[in-house]
Amino acid sequence: MISKAVYLLSDVAKWPERLRSEPGVYEIVALDRAGRPKAMRRAGGVDKRGVLYIGQGKIRDRLRKLSRGLFQGTKGHIAGRAYLARPAIQAVAPMRDLAFRFEHCDDPEKREKLRLNRYIRKFGEVPPLNAQRRLLI
């Protein structure tokens, strides 16, 4: 199960020790000013978890690539490029409020697909920074 705890993308020094460069799935989420997941309107309802992206891979490596892309302007993670290309998303989810939650697992591709499909069934669309992906249903 993916963690309920969230960690700011910008605060690498406070990323948890258990976040390793091992396979797993992660979600990029928007936080409100109080540091809680920000409710986001979707086609099929309100996403109270504030999910912007669902991804998989060697988690620490993927998140470092995303963090560098966002905060240092380097190329790399597709979610970072999608975020920087969409001012409307930046307006509702400022960079300072981007965070992640994660889980290590043995079959991250399968787990990612499962999480995306659940999201699509619930909200009628993929998370906004996953929009470049083909539908997985």
Locations of the language-model features?
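GIY-YIG nuclease catalytic motif and its immediate N-terminal context
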Residues: 1-65, 96-114, 133-137
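A sequence-level detector of short, solvent-exposed, charge-rich linear segments
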Residues: 82, 130, 134-135
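Acidic, metal/cofactor-coordinating or nucleic-acid-engaging core segments within structured domains
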Residues: 60-112, 120-122, 126
